[in-house]
Amino acid sequence: MMQIPKPKDSIWTDDQWSAIVSSGRDILVAAAAGSGKTAVLVERMIRKITAEEDPVDVDRLLVVTFTNASAAEMKHRIAEALEKELAKNPGSLHIRRQLSLLNRASISTLHSFCLQVLKKYYYMIDLDPGFRMADQTEGELLGDEVLDELFEDEYAKGNQAFFELADRYTTDRHDLDLQDLVKRVYEYSRSHPDPEVWLQSFVRLYDVTEESKMEELPFYQYVKEDAEMALFGAKQKLEKALELTKAPGGPAPRADNFLDDLQQIEELISCRHDFDALYERVPAVSFKRAKAVKGDEFDKALLDEATDLRNGAKKLIEKVKTDYFTRSPQDHLKSLADMKPVIETLVQLVISYGKRFEAAKQEKSIIDFSDLEHYCLAILTAVDEEGRRVPSEAAVYYQDQFHEVLVDEYQDTNLVQESILQLVKSGNEEAGNLFMVGDVKQSIYRFRLAEPLLFLGKYKRFTESGAGAGQKIDLNQNFRSRSDILDSTNFLFKQLMGGKIGEVDYDEQAALKLGASYPPNDAAKTELLLIDSADGADSSEDAEDFETVHWEAKAIAGEIRKLVSSPFKVYDGKTKTHRNIQYRDIVILLRSMPWAPQLMEELKNQGIPVYANLTSGYFEAVEVAAALSVLKVIDNPYQDIPLASVLRSPIVGCDENELALIRLEKKKAPFYEALKAYLANADRHDELYQKLRTFYDSLQKWRSFSTNHSVSELIWEVYRDTGYFDYAGGMPGGKQRQANLRVLYDRARSYEATAFRGLFRFLRFIERMQERGDDLGTARALSEQEDVVRLMTIHSSKGLEFPVVFTAGLGRSFNMMDLNKSYLLDKELGFGTKYIHPELRISYPTLPLVAMKKKMRRELLSEELRVLYVALTRAKEKLFLVGSCKNREKQLAKWQAQADRADWLLSEFDRYQASSYLDFIGPALIRHRDMEAHRTPGLSSSEDIARDPSRFHIRMLQQSELLEENPKERAEEKSKRLKAIQQGEPIPDSFSFDDQARRLLEWEYPYRELTAIRTKQSVSELKRKQEYEDEYSGRSLIKPSGDTLLYRRPGFMMKKGLTAAEKGTAMHTVMQHIPLTHVPTAEEAERTVRMLYEKELLTEEQQEAIDIEEIVQFFGTEIGKDLLRALRIDREVPFSMALPAGEVYKDAETAGEPLLVQGIIDCLYETADGLYLLDYKTDRIEGKFRNGFEGAAPILQKRYETQIELYTKAVEQITKTKVKGRALYFFDGGHVLTL
C-alpha cells in the first residue's frame, strides 16, 4: 500500500509520520525513550477513526496496553482528540458516535481483554459463568491444600518412583522443599502456551546414554560459550602481563613464565570445540612457579599488576576445571541418565498437581490471572482433522471484528500473550494487521517472564520497506532530554550494550538523537559522584549497606541544596516557560527500595522534603503485631512467643520480672502451662494474679466466641474488650495506629469474601502475605502532588520523566541469588538440577544446571543493562550518577585495565564479570576525556571515543568531605543571628538554648570510662588499644573507628576481597596444619594448602593469597630448624586468664576489678633448653619502613610487646614453667625479632 505523503506543516518527523500512516502489513515500531510513541499511537488511531474515506469505528480497534493506567490515559487522549475534531465539525454524527462507543472500546490490558473473551465464550471450555477472580493469597492457600492432598495420596499409594523423588528433594524432617519445587515448576510452566508440552521437554536433557556425544546435547552450546569466554579471558590477561614485562621497569624475568602459560592456554583454545579433548588437557594445565624478581631496577607496581593478571588467569582456568572437568564426560552422562526417571516422576507430579489445582478452582468458581490467559488461549484455539492447532470460531470472530490490533510496550509480552495476539490478528506478517510499539532496550520485566527475544526476532526479520516480511520503523529522536543527557547515555551504552550482554546492538539506529530544544547551560553536564567508602581506613572495607547509603544520602542532599539555592532553571511544560528548580522537579531512583527509609531520614534531617511510596512497615507496626499475637493465642495458646508478646503488651501489661515469675512455676513446660499453674494457686491475690486472671478469662471467652463468629467480628470483639483500639489512638501517631488496626479488620472482612473461613486459615493467609512480602503499607504524611523530592524504584519510573534525576546505589551488587539455587528453570532448556545421590546424600551440579547458570547470568546482566538505560533516560535536564567504592585507586586501576582497547564495545568477558552498575559504568567512563585526570597515561582508545561530544563532571568524594560543614551556610546562620540581635527580635530557634535543657543534655556520666571496658578482653583487642595509647597518659588519643570489626567476616563476604587480617588468618591456618616431620618442599606446602581448601578451612580467595615461598623460607631459618627439632610442639594454643584491670588499663578507676583475658598462642615448643614461644606475623615490612627491618624493629617491638607479655604471663601461670625464649617471625622478608 502506498504511503500517504506528509503535509508540509506537519509537526511529525518522517519516521513518526511513517509509523502513523503505514499499513497493509504487520508493523514493528522500535520507539526509543522519549520518542513520543504514545502520541504516535494515539494519532494513528485518531486518523483511522476520523478518516474521510472508510473511517473505522473505535470499537473495531483492539488496543493492548501494559497497565490499566496506560489504558485510561489512552482513552483520555482519544476522547480529547475527538472533542477537538467535534469542535471543528460540530455536525459530525460519526465523531459523536465514536465518543459514545469509546467507553466500550477494547482499549485495555491483555488480561482485561481475556476476561471479556471468557465472559462471552465461557461455554466453550465448560467454565461456570458465575466465576470470579481469586485473591492472590486465596489462590496460594488453595494450591497448598491441593498439594498437601496430592502428597498424602502419593505416600498412601506407596509409589516407589515418588519415594525416590522425595529421597532426593526432601530432608529427614519435612518435604516442604519438594512441595516448593513442584509449585515453582508449575508456576513457571504457565508462561508457556502449552505447559504440559514444555514440561515433557524437560526429559530430553536427561535422555542420554554413555555413548551420547556431549556436543550434540541441547545445553552444550552454553557450556562451550562459557568455556571459550574463560579461555580467551585468561589469554587476554596473560598477553597483558607479557606486555608489562617489556615496559621500562617491568618484570622481565617472568616473561618466560607468561609465554609458557600462554602456550598452554592457546593449546586449550585450539581444541575448545571438543569436550573430550578439553577434559584431557584442562586438568593437566600447570602454572610453573614464577621466577624471582629482585633489584631496584624493577617497578614493584608493574610486578604486582603482572602477578595479579597471572593469578586472574589461573583462577579462570581453575573455574573451568571445577565447573566442567573434575569428572569425565562418561561420568557426566551417567549422572544425567541416573536422574532421568526422577525428572520424569517430577514432571508427572507437576502435571497431576496442575489438573487437581484447576479442578479445585473450578469447584469454587474462581480463576487467577494465569487462568485468564490460558482459558482465553483455549477458547481461541481449535484442532483440525490432522491434529494441528488452528484459530477457533471465536478467534475468527475477533479477526473479523478488529480492523487492527495495536500493542503498546510490546517488548514486555510473554509467549502466552504472543499466542493470543497471533490468534486475534488477521493475515500473515507480510499482509497482517498487527501494529506493535516498544523499545527492547527498556524490557525490564524478566521477573514476570517477559520475552524480549520476541521483539528482537521480529526486528531482525522485518525490513524497512516491509518486503518479504513485516515492516520495521525506528523512532530514535528523543523529545524529552537535553543533548547532555542523550550524549552521555549514548557514550555509555555504545560501550556496554552489544552481543550476548545486552541482547541488542547499540548501533547508530539504536542511539538517541536530539529532538528537544533547550537553551545552553554549562551546569547541565552529567555528573558522577564517586564516594570512596574506605576513606583510607582498612576496617571500612567491610562497610555495610547502612554506611554506604548514609554517605550517598549526604552527597545527594548536598547537591539538592545547591540546586534549589542556585539559579538553575528548568522548563515548565504547563506554563511553557523556564523557572527556578523546585523540589518536585527532582527524583532519586534506586534499583530496589531497602535503602529508601535511610535516604529519606537523611534528607529530612537536612530539611529536604521527600516522598516515597513505601509499601512496607504495616506488619512491623507495634499495634498490628500485638493484635495478630492475640489472634494467634486465641487460635492456639500453646505458642510461647505470641503469648509472651501479648502478656508483655499493654493489653495485659506484664513486665520482664513478672514474666520470669510465671516461668518459674513450670520451667520446662509451655508458657501457657506455666501461666495456668500460676493461676492455680488460689492463695495469690497480688496485682500480677489479677492481670493474668482477667486475661485468662477473656481468652477463654474469645476462644469460645471464635467458634461461631467470623474473624472480623472476633477482631472487633477483642478491640472492644481490651480497649486496645482506644489505647492505640492515645499513642504517638494515634490516628495512624487506629487506621492500621482498622485495616486489619477490613482485611479480615475481605478474607471472608473468599472461599476460606476460620481463624487458623486467616492467620495462615496473613503469614502467606508476609512471606511473599505483600505488605499492606502504611499511610504517608506527604502526598505525591506536594513540592517534595520523589524517591522511587527504576521500575516505577518507567514511562515517567523528571527535570533532574539522581541514579543512586550504583555500587550495590546485583541480586544474583537465584543462580545459587539447587535447581534452575529456563524457557528454552527446561529444568537443570544437581545430581543427588539418594543413599550417600551427596550432590553436585549437573552440566545442564551449570549451563543454565551461565546462560541466566548473561540474561540477568542484560536485564540490568536495560534497567540502567531506563534510569538514565528519565532525566530531562540534569543527570547525576551516584555510587560508592571501597578502594578508589584500586577501582580506577581495574577500570582502566578493562578499558584498554581500541574498540567502542568493551569486551564481553569484562562485561560478564560485572557485579554492579559501577562495574559497567566505570570502564566505559574512564575512557572519556573528562576522566583523564583520574587515569594513568597510555590507555588505548580510538579517536572517535576521544572526540565524543558527551560532557561529564567527575567528582571523587571522601567521607570526610561530606562531614564538613558548609562555610556558606555557617556564614548565613551567623548573619541571621546578628541581624536578630540588632533588631531586638528573638534569636532564631537554632541558637536558643534553655539553661536547664543545656544542663540536662550536657550532663556526663562520671564513670563513663569504665563503660568502655568489657569484663572479657581478647589479647588482640588489648594490643590494638596499646597502639593508640599516648605514652604519657595511657589514654587513647585516636580511638579506633566504631566500624572496626570485632568478628571475622563470613566466607561469602571474603569473595569481595581479603583484608590484611584475613590474609594473616590464612597464613596462620597453614602454619597450624603443615606437617613438621621434615623441611617441607614447595610442592608439599602447596598440597597442604590445597587440602585445607578442599576441607573448607580456607576459602578460594585465601588459598590464592597464600605465598608458598614465604612458608618454605621459614623452615630454612634457624628458628624454623629449631622448631623441627623440638621435643614437643603445641600449635594454636587457646587460653583464658584472670588479671586485675589495673595491669591492663594503667589508670582504670577500679584497678582491682578482675578482667578475663583470652587469646590464642600461635606456637609453643619445648627443646632440651626449655620452653619457647613463637608468634607469626604477616605485617608488611619491605618498602614500608625506612632502613628496612632495622628501622622497623623498634616500632614492631613496641607494637607487639603487650601481646607477647600477656602470652608469656599466661603460659607461665598455666604451665608453671618459665618461658626461656620469645620470638616473632615476620613472613615478609623472613625476619626474626627476639623479645
Curated annotation (Swiss-Prot):
Tagged with keyword DNA repair: yes
One annotated GO molecular function: 3'-5' exonuclease activity
Domain UvrD-like helicase ATP-binding stretches: 10-482
GO biological process: double-strand break repair via homologous recombination
Keyword Nuclease listed: yes
Xref: Pfam families: PDDEXK_1 (PF12705), UvrD-helicase (PF00580), UvrD_C (PF13361)
InterPro entries: AddA (IPR014152), DNA_helicase_UvrD-like_C (IPR014017), DNA_helicase_UvrD/REP (IPR000212), P-loop_NTPase (IPR027417), PDDEXK-like_dom_sf (IPR011604), PDDEXK_AddAB-type (IPR038726), Restrct_endonuc-II-like (IPR011335), UvrD-like_ATP-bd (IPR014016)
Cofactor field: Mg(2+)
Annotated CDD domains: DEXQc_UvrD, SF1_C_UvrD
A GO CC annotation given for this chain: DNA helicase complex
Residue span(s) of domain UvrD-like helicase C-terminal: 509-799
Catalytic activity: Couples ATP hydrolysis with the unwinding of duplex DNA by translocating in the 3'-5' direction; ATP + H2O = ADP + phosphate + H(+)
NCBIfam families listed in its UniProt record: addA_Gpos
Function: The heterodimer acts as both an ATP-dependent DNA helicase and an ATP-dependent, dual-direction single-stranded exonuclease. Recognizes the chi site generating a DNA molecule suitable for the initiation of homologous recombination. The AddA nuclease domain is required for chi fragment generation; this subunit has the helicase and 3' -> 5' nuclease activities.
Protein name (database record): ATP-dependent helicase/nuclease subunit A
